[in-house]
Structures are given as C-alpha cells and as structure tokens.
Amino acid sequence: VLSEEIGDMFDIDEDMYVSILPTATQYARNAIFSGLMPQQIAKMFPELWVDEDEDEGKNLNEAPLVRTQIERFRRHDTFSYHKVNDSVGADRLLDHLGELQKNDLNVVVVNFIDMLSHARTESKMVRELANNESAYRSITLSWFRHSVMADLLKALSQTDCKIVITTDHGSIRASKPVKIVGDRNTNTNLRYKLGKNLNCQSKDVFVIKNPHEAQLPAPNISTSYVFATGSTFFAYPNNYNYYVSFYKDTFQHGGISMEEMLIPLIT
C-alpha cells in the first residue's frame, strides 16, 4: 500500500520472502535481527532469549541481537538502533539524521502497523474505522502521508544511502473460531499455541510435536506448537462465546496464511 508513495521518492526494487513460524514479533523479528532461528538464539545467546511463560518483555534485546550478527560475520560496522512508537520518537530521529548518516547501518523499528492492529482489537471506534482490509490499508496510507516517517524518507532520498524496508510478519482477519484446550501456562496468542497437552480436534490447524525439528525452542520436554491456518483463531471452551464475539473479525498474526507469511522486501 505504501509502494507508490515510496516509489515517488526512490528507485525501488520489490521482492518477497517467507516469514518463519510463528508469525509473531518475538520469533520473526528476533530471527531477522540475529540472522538465526529461534532455537539457535536460545541456545547460542540464552541471555537474549525470553520464553513465552516468562514475564519479561519478549523484544527488549533487539539491538544486542543485531550486534551478535555483525560480530558473527566478523564485521566492524558501526550501527544504531531505534524503536519509533510515536511522532516524538520520529521527530527525534529526524533531528539526528546528520549524525546517523555517519553509521554504516541504522536500524529503525516503526511500530504503527502493529499498534493499529492491537488498537483495532481493543477499541470499538478503531474497529469501526478499519472495519475491513481496504479500510485498514487506507488508514495506514493516510498515517504515512502525514507522518514524520514520510519526512524522514524524503530527507533520505536526497542522500546516497541505501534503504531496506520490510516487516517481520503480516496479519489476517480472523473469522472462524476453533476450540482448543491447554493448561494454564499456555500462551495467549489467538493464532498459535505452545504448551503441554494441547488438544484441538479441528482439521484447520498445523501441529509441530517436535519443536526442534522446526528450530523452535521447547521450554518443556512435552512442549508442542499448534498453528491456526486460513482465517481461523483459537478460543477456549471456557468463556467460548465471549472469546468469539470479542475477537471475531479482528486482525491477528502468529499462524499460517499467505497474508501472515509472505513478506514484502523493498530496497
């Protein structure tokens, strides 16, 4: 949806690649920054990996993961890392543009799309504004046109730097509930579950019984992963009707679908 806007500023090449599973930030983004699969991160850098059942934030070690990849390839690139959650953060980034251009690599995480997805789930007003895929894309485009990020890209277009734009995962409008049973330590994501003794009778799921075969960490010896496919989402038998009414037609990620897994890459 942004390619035309960006194409007015730069000569662009568009490509596509496939996200890892789960299509969730904790796994997919950490894999991009480290250049490793989740199981490899947990094994090689246990201090940088946080399991699902831990209370600690799951994406607080992104800058160190970038550093591990640079060092692993025995490079000596200077780099910076920035996470933009609001216009104040974007303004700060723009103000320091001259200084940042001295680095070999600048990594910028822009959280707007993810925040819009979560806000649409939690806010009735936002759900009305972005009530389908077309409206969702329209809001994204409107945000970009009036954002500091557009100003930042315009400023960068006047330099000779190379820009790479991508994401860690997409999202899908979840409309079909699937019952699943798990213990109280099972994670809360609606598109994938990991835990012990997971039970789901639906054919619309993909099960990984041995996580190590998929290069995924296993907090327990009996841990398995269950992924929703298509437009399904998981709901527990307890409070089933509440889950269905609250989450039906919300945009979710973590599972298996083309919308979640096919990732754009713009350079």
Please report, for each region that a protein language model flagged, where it lies by residue.
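Feature captures the catalytic ectodomains and active-site-proximal regions of enzymes
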Residues: 1-267
